[in-house]
């Protein structure tokens, strides 16, 4: 599951850091719009997150997680054929739908739904493994872009997502659905956060996310600008 997360994160959240420059050079589109497309994906993902959470709670996460790679792959395929900014933004909207379906929030909710408190260990291991995403995906994407161009690189990565995500989730999650009710009974019930604490945590997480997103999108370009 950690490796699958690397694939999905690499094909969505961390993608534009490598493809942004080649896209701008090939199309002549403004850097503001090209890099800003990631915001479209993140906004779409955030708006759909509550719905995905409710679906996981009611039906489990197998369907959403299994199809997330295919949805992101569809977005990448549309992006690869984009001849204008409208199509490019549509591609990132679709990628955002896949992000909502397949990134940490949905996966961790699904694991919690299956295993209750026992999911903590699996979540920790998955987070540790997927933390190597940029270490693995950025060099791989750079290689693909250098040898095939950004459009074909997007299509190749889309194919990897289709092959690598759907079968894993179907196999892993299909055999675990029978323990959902047990996990729910074992889960402890806590009090909801107060308004002030909730607002403070929201502000902290939002600030951290803004910094992380900005750095992940522009880090490669910044380093290249310094001659690295």
Question: How does the language model describe each region?
Answer:
Residues 6, 75, 86-102, 127, ...:
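Hydrophobic core of transmembrane alpha-helices in multi-pass small-molecule transporters
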Residues 2-31, 48-52, 138, 215-220:
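Extracytoplasmic
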Residues 12-21, 194-228:
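Extracytoplasmic gate region of multi-pass secondary transporters
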Residues 111-120, 228:
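Paired intracellular helix-loop junctions of major facilitator superfamily
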Residues 70-83:
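C-terminal ends and interior cores of transmembrane alpha-helices
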Residues 126-174:
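Helix-loop-helix hairpin linking two adjacent transmembrane segments in secondary transporters
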Residues 47-61:
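Helix-to-loop junctions at the C-terminal end of transmembrane segments
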Residues 23, 101-115:
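Intracellular juxtamembrane helix-capping segments at the cytosolic ends
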